[in-house]
Amino acid sequence: MKRYLTIIYGAASYLVFLVAFGYAIGFVGDVVVPRTVDHAIAAPIGQAVVVNLVLLGVFAVQHSVMARQGFKRWWTRFVPPSIERSTYVLLASVALLLLYWQWRTMPAVIWDVRQPAGRVALWALFWLGWATVLTSTFMINHFELFGLRQVYLAWRGKPYTEIGFQAHLLYRWVRHPIMLGFVVAFWATPMMTAGHLLFAIGATGYILVALQFEERDLLAALGDQYRDYRREVSMLLPWPHRHT
């Protein structure tokens, strides 16, 4: 019974992630979904800035603290290791859904590209960014990243085994193509409002800080293998002179 509950929990967490990820595209792009970065709850500008920063902070703290090895060691004293990743994914998704629900509109326009070719180019970059995010997850192990492999192994009664480090496709050009895709998607917009700008700056700043912690953990886990990889491949921008 426990094995079935484990895989049901992992699948449910993944479904919540899919909802949060799909909504993120509409939220940032201001398309399809009812509440977006440009059309959310009306509020005075001061209140909007504070609330939006708190929402970004909640996601940042959850996402970074729960990803650290020290927290994982403590957390798995209470949560079975097989669902640790699924729980992380679930809580990160809930933090995003909270952000979508409580975001405050900041409607002042920073830029508005009216030239058709410019709009098409920016929309193309927007979709390219999201496509990069999604496809990059499969270039490592999508199912491991979102906890499905862990719960599947538990369901089968098999021990968990680490997946070795390999740099495939985009990972041969940048160390963090998922984060690169997010940054491109957050900034590529024909119309940048103050709210969207706050979101883009906050999210990009968080990514740059969080990557420092991620790199430290990877160095600790992989040692010289990752140290050599860092020397050969840029973190976010695919500089050709570093690629070998």
From Swiss-Prot:
<feature type="transmembrane region" description="Helical">
    <location>
        <begin position="7"/>
        <end position="27"/>
    </location>
</feature>
<keyword id="KW-0472">Membrane</keyword>
<comment type="function">
    <text>Catalyzes the methylation of methanethiol (MeSH) to yield dimethylsulphide (DMS).</text>
</comment>
<feature type="transmembrane region" description="Helical">
    <location>
        <begin position="181"/>
        <end position="201"/>
    </location>
</feature>
<dbReference type="InterPro" id="IPR054700">
    <property type="entry name" value="MddA"/>
</dbReference>
<feature type="transmembrane region" description="Helical">
    <location>
        <begin position="41"/>
        <end position="61"/>
    </location>
</feature>
<comment type="similarity">
    <text>Belongs to the nurim family.</text>
</comment>
<keyword id="KW-1133">Transmembrane helix</keyword>
<dbReference type="GO" id="GO:0008168">
    <property type="term" value="F:methyltransferase activity"/>
</dbReference>
<keyword id="KW-0808">Transferase</keyword>
<feature type="transmembrane region" description="Helical">
    <location>
        <begin position="90"/>
        <end position="110"/>
    </location>
</feature>
<dbReference type="GO" id="GO:0032259">
    <property type="term" value="P:methylation"/>
</dbReference>
<feature type="transmembrane region" description="Helical">
    <location>
        <begin position="120"/>
        <end position="140"/>
    </location>
</feature>
<dbReference type="GO" id="GO:0016020">
    <property type="term" value="C:membrane"/>
</dbReference>
<keyword id="KW-0489">Methyltransferase</keyword>
<protein>
    <recommendedName>
        <fullName>Methanethiol S-methyltransferase</fullName>
        <ecNumber>2.1.1.334</ecNumber>
    </recommendedName>
</protein>
<keyword id="KW-0812">Transmembrane</keyword>
<dbReference type="InterPro" id="IPR033580">
    <property type="entry name" value="Nurim-like"/>
</dbReference>
<keyword id="KW-0949">S-adenosyl-L-methionine</keyword>
